[in-house]
From Swiss-Prot:
One of its GO terms (molecular function) is phloroglucinol reductase activity. Keywords: Aromatic hydrocarbons catabolism, Cytoplasm, NADP, Oxidoreductase. Menadione, hydroquinone and 2,4,6-trihydroxybenzoate are not substrates and inhibit the reverse reaction by 33%, 31% and 49% respectively. 100% inhibited by 0.1 mM p-chloromercuribenzoate and by 0.1 mM CuCl(2). This is Phloroglucinol reductase. Its main location: cytoplasm. InterPro entries: NAD(P)-bd_dom_sf, Sc_DH/Rdtase_CS, SDR_fam. Its EC number is 1.3.1.57. Belongs to the short-chain dehydrogenases/reductases (SDR) family. Optimum pH is 7.8 for the forward reaction.
Amino acid sequence: MVPCNKEFVTNMFSVEGKVALVTGATGALGKVLAKTYGYNGAKVVLTGRNQGKLDALVEEFKAEGIDCTAISADPAKEDDVKKLIADAVKAYGRIDILAVCHGFNKPANILEQSVEDWQYIMDADCKSVYIICKYVAQQMVDQLGGKTPESGKGGKIVVATSQRSKRGMAGYTGYCTSKGGADMMIASMACDLSAKYGININAICPTVFRSELTEWMFDVNSEVYKNFLKREPIGRLAEPEDFAGYAMFLSSDASNFITGAACDCSGGYLVC
């Protein structure tokens, strides 16, 4: 048990010197979280499927003083993930934080959606989360050297799912199913990992946030924007930066007693 002293209180949100692996790093959310870790003193491993975009991101980050490297990988492929982890450990010696920020959706009415498209969504949003979390957790366990650390001291895993894991929507059968499955998978993984290995795993469940794919929803004069805002007590749609603090909290000692949670960060969407 850590006493409530000045050192603990002033360092509880620190990720200084940690190694953070961020998937979907070239996307809006992944880039913000990777920068947040880097600005706060973590070494960052950026991963995604587009090496060109990753290389550009490394150049940008290093110009801002962030210690980082980029490794391309498909998180839905076991061999890719195993190599990714091996290369990350070769670069920085360990992995302390995993932030899972990749995802995919292809909306369609259930009567029109092909089984192949549904399966692709499940692979991208659920199977890939299982694979990356499984093998990073194994790396975190290996780093312990047989010791059982205090809660949260074995590693932190943060997975971006969605408020759609909690509420259905027409045309989103595949997406809602995959995100709901990911939330329950995270809860079950916590039962496997937290007490024995000190690895905390949690989900953040955001509402719609600005990205290349959702930019069209941010036209304040559109009916889509106006209708969505009726369900947002906070009065606006989200920016990816809105979730940086939540991810930092779940990646730091401040959240050592939190695991298996699907944390709502929807601007109040779920209460209306």
